[in-house]
Amino acid sequence: MGKIVITVGKRKRAIARAVAREGKGRIRINKIPIELIEPKYKRMKLMEPILLAGEEVISQMDIDVTVKGGGVMGQMDAARTAIGKAIVEFTGSKELRDKFLAYDRTLLVSDARRTEPHKPSRSTKGPRAKRQKSYR
């Protein structure tokens, strides 16, 4: 049947699942080809791991990414991480892994920062809201 690799990328509330399989170099985000993603800055962010890996590596695989939750840029970052992980795991190349880490660590490691939960006091204002202190 061929080699199949499944990876996950996360950013804030967005979760992306990438499935890499042997193919001709097609990459789709939520069934949309990566070339048709608009605006351009989102497409360029998604293309970073692909451009770093090179055409000869990408032309051997197809990657399908499904992204859910979060906002627009959170989804792009999650998809980017999932694509980066899928490429490295599919090729099994340590050089490529080191190249990705040297360029940007978030290509392989999900950003662990999450929104801080609201605290009980004055919870509608946010997690750290306090009344302003006056000295006079």
Curated annotation (Swiss-Prot):
| PROSITE patterns reported in the protein's UniProt record | RIBOSOMAL_S9
GO MF annotations, alphabetized: RNA binding; structural constituent of ribosome
A single GO BP: maturation of SSU-rRNA from tricistronic rRNA transcript (SSU-rRNA, 5.8S rRNA, LSU-rRNA)
Short name of one Pfam family? Ribosomal_S9
- Bias (Basic residues) ranges: 120-136
InterPro entries hit by this protein: Ribosomal_Su5_D2-typ_SF, Ribosomal_uS9, Ribosomal_uS9_archaeal, Ribosomal_uS9_CS, Ribsml_uS5_D2-typ_fold_subgr
* SUPFAM superfamilies from the UniProt entry: Ribosomal protein S5 domain 2-like
UniProt keyword annotations, A-Z: Ribonucleoprotein, Ribosomal protein
* Annotated spans, Disordered: 111-136
Note the superkingdom of the native organism.
Archaea
A GO CC annotation recorded here is: cytosolic small ribosomal subunit
Q: PANTHER family, alphabetically?
A: RIBOSOMAL PROTEIN S16, RIBOSOMAL PROTEIN S9
Family affiliation: Belongs to the universal ribosomal protein uS9 family.
NCBIfam families named in the record = PRK00474.1 (NF001749), uS9_arch (TIGR03627)
Record's protein name:
Small ribosomal subunit protein uS9
